[in-house]
Amino acid sequence: MAKKGLLGRKIGMTQVFADNGVAVPVTVVQAGPCVVVQKKTVEKDGYEAVQIGFGDVREKLLNKPKRGHLKNAGVRLVRVLREIKVDSMDEYKVGQELKADVFSAGEYVDVVGTSKGKGFAGGIKRHNFKRGPMKHGSKYHRRPGSAGAKGPARIFKGRKMPGRMGNERVTVQKLQVVRVDAERNLLLIKGAVPGPKRGLLLIKSSIKAK
């Protein structure tokens, strides 16, 4: 499968019916339109990639470096910039517009987003710890318990403990594109994708698809 990608926003979830009548849960994603801002080359940058931009923005909301970068490229002002790896750099030109129809129904994609923030969470919610007895004199209900032995007299790095949960980069792999609405730049992707409604997403070709 050719490597390609798009930026988009999560609209919400719904369901569609397959040809055999089975209801399929899908996430509706506004994918694009994106614009090619820059082509990274091995000679100049040490690697090959295509930089794409997404989302309209007023000029005064951009900082000077970003504003100058976009003006030098001769493209419209965009809110978000991301890089994607592609198979053939020759297929892309600076200023070219990428729409939802770069993907087709039946393809598999990886979706990258930022998960919903849950705030400060305990061990049971955050790490699926087992709780203690709720009765028979127990005072150990939802506490984390021992965090380490007496010997080292310290807590090792990586110890699972209560703390802030969510609001981190999450990738869900090998989700199937059920439908493509090229006119409205919509992708219907089977299953759930990370983040809240209106959350920014990067949709790219699945690395696990055969």
Curated annotation (Swiss-Prot):
Transmembrane segments: none annotated. Residues 132-144 have a biased composition (Basic residues). Keywords: Ribonucleoprotein, Ribosomal protein, RNA-binding, rRNA-binding. One of its GO terms (biological process) is translation. One of its GO terms (molecular function) is rRNA binding. One of the primary rRNA binding proteins, it binds directly near the 3'-end of the 23S rRNA, where it nucleates assembly of the 50S subunit. Part of the 50S ribosomal subunit. Forms a cluster with proteins L14 and L19. This is Large ribosomal subunit protein uL3. It comes from Heliobacterium modesticaldum (strain ATCC 51547 / Ice1). The gene is rplC.
